[in-house]
Amino acid sequence: MPKTRKYSTVDEEKILKVSLSLATKEDVLEWSHGEVTKPETINYKSYKPERHGLFDELIFGPATDYKCPICGKKYKKSNEGLTCNNTPQCEIEKPEILPKISRRSRMGHIALQTPVVHFWFFKIDNSIISKLLVLRVGESNEYVSKNDLENIIYYKSHIVLDNGGLKSLPKNKIININNAAQIYKDALIELRELNLNDADALEIIDGTINHLNDIVGSKVGNDYGVDFYELNEVIEEYSSAKIQTGSKAIEFLLENIDLEEEQRKIKSKIKEINNLEKTSSSRKQDLSKLYKRLQVVESFINSGQKPTSMLIYNLPVIPAELRPLVQLDGGRHSTSDINELYRRIIIRNNRLRKWIELNAPTLITQNELRMIQEAVDALIDNSKKKPKPVTSKDNRNLKSISDALTGKKGRFRQNLLGKRVDYSGRSVIVVGPELKMNQVGIPREMAAKLFEPWIIKELIDQEITLSVKSARKLIDNLNPIIWPHVAKVIQGRPVLLNRAPTLHRLSIQAFEPVLIRGKAIKLHPLVTTAFNADFDGDQMAVHVPISDEAVREAKELLFANRNILGPKDGEPIINPSQDMILGIYYLTIEIAGAKGEAKVFQDVNSMLRAYEEGSVSLHARVAIPFKKLQKTFNLKGDKGYIFSTVGKFIFNQAFPENFPFIFDSSVSSISDAQEYTKKYYIPYGLNIKETIQNTPINDALSKKDLSKIIRTIFDKYVPVLTKEDVASVINDVNHTNYKDTSTKFANLVTTNKTALEYIHAESLSKFTTKHFVDVNKKLSLKTPGNPNQPIWEVDQYVELLENVWFDYVNIVASVLDEIKDLGFKFSTKSGTSISIHDIEVSDNKKERIKEGDDYTSELKSMYREGLLTDDERYSLTINKWSEVKDNIQNDLKKIVKNNPLNPIFIMMNSGARSNMANYVQLAGIRGLMTNNTKILKSDAENERVVRSTVEIPVKSSFLDGLTAYEFYSSTHGARKGLTDTALNTAKSGYLTRRLVDVAQGIVVTEKDCATQNGFVVKDIVDNKTKTVIVPIRERIEGRFTIEDVKDKDGNVIVEKDTLIDAKMAEEIVEVHDVKEVNIRSILGCEAKNGVCQKCFGKDLATSRIVSIGEAVGITASQSIGEPGTQLTMRTFHSGGVAGVEDITGGFGRLTELIDAYRSPWGRPAIISKVDGIITEIKTPKDKNTNLVYITYLDQDDASQTEVVSVPKNRTLRVKVGDKIVKGQKIIDGPIILEELLEYGGPRKVQSYLLKEIQKIYRMQGIAINDKYIEIIISQMLSKIEISEPGDSDFIIGSLVNNLDFYNTNNELLEKGLEPAKGKVVIHGAKRIPLLSNSFLAAASYQESAKILVNSSISSQQDFLVGVKENIILGKKIPAGTNSQYESKSKFDIRDPKEYFKDKSPQRHYKIEMDNEVSDMFNEFRISQNK
């Protein structure tokens, strides 16, 4: 693609890279279509743009399509690009015929009378100009500061550019109002000495000196200073000195800088400092400054740009439509702030031109020059302008160009990363229990608007109306004639539903629209969990995918029935809840001695009839001959019976025939169906009644049991073939073999390279037979001739494939729909209701409370006697009341167990609503309440007792009613809960945004990176409590091994490069008791620009190996950020002590880790700097410290001792004789990450971060997979700071991606050159996006100006690797269906017609038919086609 710096209409997909560089004055003229010389906008009478003004139609394009801006003649579209010659004026001006959209792209310019320094280059990132120049005053050690340069730019100070041999005027000396008189005086005296022989010169110089002396002592001199310009003139007249101010001075300095020489000097200074044996902190600062300066200098050298490009000579005027003037009612106008800022520049520029022409006094001209500089500054970045920004009449800061870029409402985030979408609507949602899982109810009126173009086409095709206009009128008037056509049009056109906030990818899913009356969208009740929706007024947005590719993506990837598992932990996210659970629980309750118990029915239908007649109870256990049940039991003997409750027989009808029968809640054992069923099998001849009565009652199925059943169904019926595989069988189906396809399906190989299980082949065969008959029937109605065997074309094969494929992938969803229907039906039938009398209370409550009161009064008397401190008394009181509440809770648990049919307990036990904690407050005691306290960092550091709990508990329950004091006491906690939730939501959203920016570019890019770096995993254990946080079994499942896994005897259990599934993981851990496994990990992956399949392992949302093209980085960020709202902000108090433990849970600690804080909350841990053995722990007398002695071997294998001093009041984590490794804690507390990195190395930091982040989430009961946290951690440690560049092109002090670093070093070593040296550095999530290789991605995150400034001076190129930069350009993102995916993978969503290329519509395949007429008819059709 040709390189262009002009606005161009290029196909986005052809853009390969974008570069950003400084615009020269020639560039601006090339962009411009004319100079703006007047500050006017539009004429107040005619409302037409003024000529040469800010909205001039000749410069910026016409306000009306294809209309000449001069004579007003209208042209056709075909004349676009020509010029109008209608009038003599037109012939002179040559106006181009253009559409009005050109006003969004055509630019103008203002030719400034003086160059202006670009605001960003002396204000942003500590002034690029200042870093570049670093001016030294003469031969002294004094340097020109950043502020001095600013004073020059704003004409407050002057600078000596050339001393002309005058010693009193050293080069680069700054002359300001304070020191001017003395400097000029010394200079004039020296000048006098040099001009003793020139009488005229002496006279003028003496006169000037006398005048200077007069002014210095006078009031005028003190108030206004000296006249710089007059004195400069005299000095410049009689010497070759040069003193200047303003942008001209800066221009001179930038023109005369020798970049190569500067580069050489900086490098030698760096070498000098590095060669010193000891470097002090001030030297380190100098080094840091030199590195930064070197980067700026090398940026200019490498990009080949001139430093003077940082000055503005011609100021671009952005297109008129991007700074619009909007007409309001009443003849008033509202204008964009940018127009006001441009007007100020034009007015000042015109005035300056006038002063120059009139040869006005220098002071007046100088003032105008300063004002122009300030006006351009305000246009570029008004918010940073000092002393105060330009304001409007109502004292509001005007929005400049920088302000329009940054922030949530800026160009990047408002217009480029998020756009408004056509063909969309939104409405309130209501529940739609009658819908199938892949359906959504769309209001008719909404559908008529959303699908308008398709409806118009259909109406015209059916000759209901003849024109688009009349069709649109029918739709707008909602004419009843349109509804059948609306229903026809929406068939096979899915819609996307989105609920804000879109916290994870399941917040957008696709559904098939179903027309409904009313104005609310009907949502399927099972998908509410994924959307986090409820029906209390939530709204949802609907979008219509338009292109064929988008429709296929929606059906294959976004359909709700394809998103059963949640990506964060791989568990089903589509689980029945509330009413449905209550219904299923009620349906599966067993009651001994219920009506009709032990009855025998001949089959399920006769049992159902008896139930409907009321002769048998739903909860009675009855028997049915097992031969009559359509279930595969694999039991010997054929005359026995199966017994269960009527309800369970009904419940089991929801499952496929080849799914085991569910008898009880031991769901995990149904995989071994034979053993499981034996318990409920009565062999022929046994007494049925006795057997049933002697069998213990089973618990009903609760929420947890249902969850396990759904997981089992998913694992059993999830599609294991690709669409291409199914198409290969359907391609051979015809009228003779359509009933017998099971063998062909059974011969297919699954995606896991195993043989297809029989249940899959059987299901597919059944679907094929069913749909073949349907499609054939449909076709025979259309086809005359032989109606039984019509000729199939490619469309019929596609239809058959689509129907069979949909049924195959919908098996799990259809079972869930059945469960949902049963749940709703039987929760209604149960008639569950609760009353105040259903709340059962404990008889022991008063005794328990009395016990607490007695204990606390005893503590008070001990405190009064001085046996306890107040803090100890408080802590013991809190502990006692917690114990009392626990005892009352245990009493209530017994009551719940003894009354299983109480409606409240049914709700609790089933998991439909509420839990024990709620019931304790309802029927027992409310307990302790939170207090209004703030924990300070000093409290945590000094481990003070913080009284965050009111020590007098609320002794009443809600059933008793609270006293006035108790009610007041509980208000603080109740309000805190609500405010915390609100604050948490915002914080969690911001965290997700930061994480997405960190990981957005990480996509699965290749199969295998062949890395040798594994990651050893074992149980994550909380060392304090010795509890397992994440078991090893969970950590290794779904990961590849990097080496053979062996048992204790050295026998190989799992070979290298094997994906560990759930069974293997169980075998490794439970059977062979392996404690640690070396696996492939993202932390060791060497794939460029992403990760490889083997290092990532299993995709949790599909339970298969992750597909190439999967945007795992964004999934990871969403998985960590989405549950963020559930993380508490409250801190856990162990007996009220504000220690480190307070923050181990909750949001604060998570932010602290992810942002890599330098000083974590609480007192940090002390870690070992060496690998050794603890030989001694001493406590010196009269000291508050312990001395820990560690013996270790140094580099020469000599024994050394390291003494670590630790505070006495801290918990030691080591004892004498312990082995200790680098980075291990000596005392408790949070570890400082940078310290751990320095002593323990990157691997230790990775393990520590992983453990700590998992700890935070698991404490709240949230399961997140390791691999997502690994992605974020790998990004945090992905940069290397260069200390010595060797023979590479790296710049000292720069940050380089670790893979680039290692690859460059390998290349250098192969060539025998010196490699670069550097150290790994850790960055928090706030910093990482700013270090991105893509300037577009970085600038759209934060600090836009700084990123753009640094990118432009180095002429940086963005190769569009990540997701964000492609979205900004409007390109397809390099992930998913636009990635280099493999054939037959998740993203291989091609047009189904491609599977039937041999069945093209042009050639009909004559199927053998008996009917002669049909033969003739077909021959005729074939000859016609030929």
Curated annotation (Swiss-Prot):
GO biological process: DNA-templated transcription
Gene Ontology MF annotations: DNA binding; DNA-directed RNA polymerase activity; magnesium ion binding; zinc ion binding
Cofactor(s), names only, from the UniProt record: Mg(2+); Zn(2+)
Transmembrane segments: none
InterPro entries tied to this protein: DNA-dir_RpoC_beta_prime, DNA-dir_RpoC_beta_prime_bact, RNA_pol_asu, RNA_pol_N, RNA_pol_Rpb1_1, RNA_pol_Rpb1_3, RNA_pol_Rpb1_3_sf, RNA_pol_Rpb1_4
Keywords for the protein's UniProt record, in alphabetical order: DNA-directed RNA polymerase, Magnesium, Metal-binding, Nucleotidyltransferase, Transcription, Transferase, Zinc
EC number(s) reported in the record: 2.7.7.6
Binding of Mg(2+), residues: D534, D536, D538
Source superkingdom: Bacteria
Positions that bind Zn(2+): C1009, C1085, C1092, C1095
Root EC class: transferase
One protein family per Pfam: RNA_pol_Rpb1_2
Cellular component terms per the entry's GO annotation: DNA-directed RNA polymerase complex
Entry similarity comment: Belongs to the RNA polymerase beta' chain family.
Assembly and binders: The RNAP catalytic core consists of 2 alpha, 1 beta, 1 beta' and 1 omega subunit. When a sigma factor is associated with the core the holoenzyme is formed, which can initiate transcription.
Protein known as: DNA-directed RNA polymerase subunit beta'
